[in-house]
Amino acid sequence: MGTATGAGYFQRGSLFWFTVITVSFGYYTWAVFWPQSIPYQSLGPLGPFTKYLVDHYHTFLRNGYWLAWLIHVGESLYALVLCKRKGITDVQAQLLWFLQTFLFGVASLSILIAYRSKRQKHN
């Protein structure tokens, strides 16, 4: 989905990065909220490493988890600012940028940062 230019510009990010982010954040969520249900012995080197972090640094993991979401909120708000600066005025496109950036962070925001509207190209 994407319009090349204009007020309604939106481009979906890379499926590869969205998959990596979803799996990673899902695992992080699992480690923070349900660490007792993780089959550590079945995860190769990742298992003992995760178990060590959960056993010794669970507070840091939890705080880092909420910090990551807070950063995503900030990135999403910045995406709205960038939309306005780049002439993306369509409300639906702005909402899509906000949601995509909230869920996938810099993987989405980098696409918006790289976008140059016709208005910007002439300057």
UniProtKB/Swiss-Prot annotation:
Name this polypeptide is given: Transmembrane protein 254
Topology in membrane: Multi-pass membrane protein
Top-level taxon of origin: Eukaryota
Gene designation: Tmem254
Record InterPro entries: TMEM254
Main location: membrane
Membrane-crossing residue ranges in chain numbering: 15-35, 63-83, 95-115
Cellular localisation: Membrane
Disulfides per UniProt: none
Keyword match Ligase: no
PANTHER family: TRANSMEMBRANE PROTEIN 254 (PTHR34104:SF3)
Cellular compartments per GO CC: membrane
Sorted UniProt keywords: Membrane, Transmembrane, Transmembrane helix
